[in-house]
Amino acid sequence: MTHPLFAKHESTLTQALQAQETRGYWSPFPEMPSPKVYGETANADGEQSFKALLNQTFDLDQPSNGLVGQEHSPFGFALGVRYPKTEPDPLFAAVARAQQPWQRAGRDAWIGVSLEILQRLNRASFEIAYSVMHTTGQAFMMAFQAGGPHAQDRALEAIACAWDQLRRIPAQAYWEKPQGKNPPLAMEKHFTIVPRGIGLVLGCCTFPTWNSYPGLFADLATGNAVVVKPHPGAILPLAITVRIARDVLREAGFDPNVVTLLATDPDDGTLVQQLATRPDVRLIDFTGSTHNGNWLERNATQAHVYTEKAGVNQIVIDSVDDIKAAARNIAFSLALYSGQMCTAPQNIYVPRNGIRTADGTLSFDEVGQAIAEAVQKLTSDSAKAVELIGAIQNDAVVQRIERARALGSVLLDSQPLVHPAFEHARVHTPLLVRLDAATDQNRFTQEWFGPIAFVIATDSTAQSLALAGSIAAQHGALTLSVYSGDEAVQQVAHEAAIKGGVALSLNLTGGVFVNQSAAFSDFHGTGANPAANATLTDAAFVANRFRVVQSRAHVAPRG
């Protein structure tokens, strides 16, 4: 019998499957925070719900023995939210008890409950948006879109991928093999989908929902219980998520400990390593540093580990029709959320002899100046700039800006800005530094996370593309952007992207930016270079989260 929540959301699931097959634009979750869509009071209600959580204890009825929480808004104030402190052993014991009936419920229940959680999360998009804004430093519009509907899109994508794999496995089958003149051999076979076990989702501090939802919902949709361990600097968005998930599970008749929160104070690295190597943790989804991701891949051998780590995203400029349009697009990508996106560009390669344009040749210096001026134009008005660049998530990024200044000649210096609504906000404009491929490779072959970019002189476009491909392959990258009107150069760019295992964008000058990745159409990460060992979202991301156990017995032939 079909689970009622599966039946309730089946049409959405069907549309999601169709969207994945065609790879066109589709989303059931409106990305604009419009009162016509979400309700006239939705924004105010969401903000009030967020404010009501501040300086309070976040109540979750799960095993706990104390309180933790030291989040501080990048916009300049302490959140003061305290969360249940949970010891791993009693928590995992409770999760194991909850896992058993959840596993027996079957795929219709797993999918239906997951989709209901997602619908409830969409209703809470404004509350989540304010929590994302004040833990990550994203400006409100990005916090709403990336933290809400876009994250929900990625969650739905994972659920649809999971269902696509689960539905291929029949519950039972009749098998009959002819035996010539003798009666046929006949068997009845039963196939049971067996989830891997307990999943551990390790969140990051810049995109706590967008990067965590795919793993969380891939686990749930394949029948696994999930322990959500947020980054200590961005607990609240995932705490709200867990609260909603537990409410839905309880209403659906399941133990809410199928989804639990494990909140921590800062400097929790030792605890994370202990959690990740527990024998009962069978799945791990991680977003964060290369160092920590590599440690998990090497040491959490009892689990299947999905990682997204650091990378060096790159732009190659060979030729452009309109340098102003190209520079505007690049500048927006550099400024958006102060470069604190895993897809944000860092290295911009320009031939030292200049580039071709519709108006003639532009020198290397003129190209660098065009980009610098475009960034400056976007950030010159503080009131407008802060709605684009947001705030810096933590002091380590500010310190990194200071170190990057000394790497080369500064084309555009980073400046602190005063936020008109939050006077203590940590706001800094992008830094552009000139480097040279001949002498500075040790400086630009690592990620400089934050509002930091390098305009790098190369001997030729051929060298630029060779660098882009080799750096992606060796050091990791999620995005590569190339500007060229030459079809031969574009073909070499495709080959460099394939060599580097990195997504390629060509000649972006309009309203699409290299940072952006659209669910149901764009694959985020390839798993083909060190930046990530998995893709959001393909069959490989979900299929290994369960196994199939069969039983068979002789029966009388039907014929």
Language model: regions and residue ranges:
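Conserved C-terminal structural/oligomerization subdomain of aldehyde/semialdehyde dehydrogenase
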Residues: 1-18, 104-112, 125, 253-256, ...
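ALDH superfamily catalytic-core signature
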Residues: 3-12, 37-40, 213, 247-253, ...
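Extended hydrophobic secondary-structure segments that form protein cores and membrane-embedded regions
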Residues: 199, 259-265, 347-349, 451, ...
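N-terminal Rossmann-like NAD(P)+-binding subdomain of aldehyde/semialdehyde dehydrogenases
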Residues: 1-184, 218
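Generic non-transmembrane alpha-helical segments
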Residues: 116-124, 244-252, 370, 374, ...
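Short, solvent-exposed amphipathic alpha-helical segments in soluble enzyme
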Residues: 215-218, 300-302, 332-333, 469-472, ...
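Rossmann-like NAD(P) dinucleotide-binding subdomain of oxidoreductase/dehydrogenase enzymes
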Residues: 166-327
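Short, flexible turn/loop "capping" segments at secondary-structure junctions
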Residues: 71-72, 307-309, 340-343, 443-449, ...
